Amino acid sequence: MKKTPVFLESLVTNMLRLRAICPFSWRVFQFRPISCEPLIIQMNKCTDEEQMFGFIERNKAILSEKQVGCAFDMLWKLQKQKTSLLKNAEYVRDHPQFLTLHNLATNKFKLMNDDTLVNVLYVTQQFAGEAHDPLVEALVTEAWRRLERFDIKLLSEFSSCLADQHLYFSPLMGKIADIVHRNLETTQDLSSLSVLMVNISSLISRHFQQQLVNKTELLFDTIDSSEVNVAKSIAKFLRNVRYRYQPLLERCNNVFLSNVDHLDLDSISKILSVYKFLQFNSFEFIIMAKKKLTEMIPLCNHPASFVKLFVALGPIAGPEEKKQLKSTMLLMSEDLTGEQALAVLGAMGDMESRNSCLIKRVTSVLHKHLDGYKPLELLKITQELTFLHFQRKEFFAKLRELLLSYLKNSFIPTEVSVLVRAISLLPSPHLDEVGISRIEAVLPQCDLNNLSSFATSVLRWIQHDHMYLDNMTAKQLKLLQKLDHYGRQRLQHSNSLDLLRKELKSLKGNTFPESLLEEMIATLQHFMDDINYINVGEIASFISSTDYLSTLLLDRIASVAVQQIEKIHPFTIPAIIRPFSVLNYDPPQRDEFLGTCVQHLNSYLGILDPFILVFLGFSLATLEYFPEDLLKAIFNIKFLARLDSQLEILSPSRSARVQFHLMELNRSVCLECPEFQIPWFHDRFCQQYNKGIGGMDGTQQQIFKMLAEVLGGINCVKASVLTPYYHKVDFECILDKRKKPLPYGSHNIALGQLPEMPWESNIEIVGSRLPPGAERIALEFLDSKALCRNIPHMKGKSAMKKRHLEILGYRVIQISQFEWNSMALSTKDARMDYLRECIFGEVKSCL
């Protein structure tokens, strides 16, 4: 037999001696688990926090860094099963064994692997009570040290931890953005990328933003159609960067539509919020969301959940649901927090609900919490209460005092503009010298949005103050001059259309002072060659809002549309056509431009939102363009039924606007395209709408008397006449073949009375109703809204009305208010001569 080596015999002997001398140590050594698996299995068997804390107490001396991570993970899993998360989080956070676990993590975090480190950070943040938890700070620092080796999944989880701490602008988030940028080409995990996109969205350039959008489009087909969270993150990213990118939004919307049965209140609420912000319209989703949310009404019996339901469902609910929501909110109103009351007020504004009882209850909650609101929230409160016609001196006095105190201590341009805007909306919008000096101090740092907001506010003050504060008005006029100076300076220093576009996104051209608007148009013309398929829709939308006719810009837009039509998303077409309609302008290649646009949209007519299709049809009608396919798509029973359904979920004012545009389109087609044989079906609507026509104001009565003198008596002129198809004519008279006025006889109306319909039929052409050779004359006084801002060029709606009146047999005389109020017509005699020239001479229009 082979002899055992001496060193082995010695080793065994020593071990046996050790066992005899230290039986306790041997026992501990013998029964200590070699693997961490048994402890993890024990943790997984815990069914509540008490069991977990008992486990931690028993094993705190032997828990490894991995087991510490598992303990945090298990506590979070148990926490998510609770109905009252906040209350239970306090219980966990205050438990002595949670502090034990906290200390263990503090001692062992450097030994943790990357996944465990980030997971412990996430869970610790969920339970953290202190604003600056030392463990959280240590974990973030350690993660920063390891950042370069994180894979994209871990990077996204870590970025979410930073986002939870509101570190969107931190150097660390910037480092994450840099890593994403460097690795974008090889990234294939859209789920993780979409989370990162949201978290780094505050730091990225426009070029990087477009790269992320392109990458998302490439990877979108790699995700399952049930990946709602990915679609939500993508939509949220587009919201954060203010980019209404139609193709991606549609793909996200398709995911939401296919999973709507699985969406909860929180998800639907967030999706609707994104759609509202980006002005993305999805009739199908809203209808399905409305049904789902309505079913939740009986289930939401807690203020937090009911407020969320009220905000999401209220603006799209039907009359009965709105009534139910408001009555329930009245019962809960006293239990609202300040944040919830603000959300309810915003929803009431969206609903255009002026329920005085609910407004009173909500404002009483707002009043209690007024000191805790931030400037932007105070602006929202002011805007909504002004819109809802709320009047309570005590509330507005406190609001004004609070806004002024904020203003005196604010040095951030955007914040100052928000505060000034809110003050200008108050019942007494006066601003003292301290306020004016605060505006002047931030002017050099202001962007176009801030400058435009200041200008609008100052104009409100001048309008309010000019009657009794001459000295202050002079200072306000000087402030306007400074605003103009800095606005021009900013525009002249613009070196990129992309950067300019960013500032234009939230601007409305009709709020721009005249001189600044001219400079803006000149700047856009300077960058005209940079207008392309990506930005043409945005530029067109801005021009539509300016009422400023720039033929150079419109020609460029038309050229881009024709040459790059295949790259333009079809749903951008209505925005591209709109400025031509509003400004009544035909580009050189008019027929090719309009034909190309309509052809590009034809295959999408069935899926375009109904009200957008109506607006498009109306825009084309003002341009005398009537594509038969489009009109057939609108004027059929199926489409009109869809439109009726959509009108129920629109706000009252928007619904009324859609109905009015449909009527105008119907009227235009009947008058200008009788060959299409589309019936007129708006008699009842027009009768209801025109019930609101009141008597003549002072200026109209003055003109009426002058016309009566010119024509030979008040029985020779009519005011506020309704024509067939319900056009309203300011003044009407009839001349016989010898240019002699014909009296109306028994049809004469007294001053200020509602006129009768002049003709019985809404269909007949009126020429046959007159004596041979006689002519019916319509005198139209055009205010500033009827003309372009820069030249006396008639806008689209006024031009269309003139065409219609001529089809109905009128000779149309249009007089602009600029001509009527000019120095040349400053006396009554001059005006009388002018009217005689217009009516009896050859002058048909002063334009």
UniProtKB/Swiss-Prot annotation:
It is found in: Mitochondrion. Disulfide bonds: none annotated. One of its GO terms (molecular function) is RNA binding. Expression detected in spleen, thymus, testis, ovary, colon, heart, smooth muscle, kidney, brain, lung, liver and white adipose tissue with highest expression in heart. One of its GO terms (cellular component) is mitochondrion. Pfam families: FAST_1, FAST_2, RAP. SMART domains: RAP. Keywords: Acetylation, Mitochondrion, Transit peptide. Residues 777-837 form the RAP domain. The modification N6-acetyllysine is found at residue 360. PROSITE patterns: RAP (PS51286). It comes from the Eukaryota. GO terms for biological process: mitochondrial RNA metabolic process; mitochondrial RNA processing; regulation of mitochondrial mRNA stability. The RAP domain is essential to regulate MT-ND3 mRNA levels. Involved in the down-regulation of mitochondrial MT-ND3 mRNA levels which leads to decreased respiratory complex I abundance and activity. Belongs to the FAST kinase family. This is FAST kinase domain-containing protein 1, mitochondrial. The gene is FASTKD1.
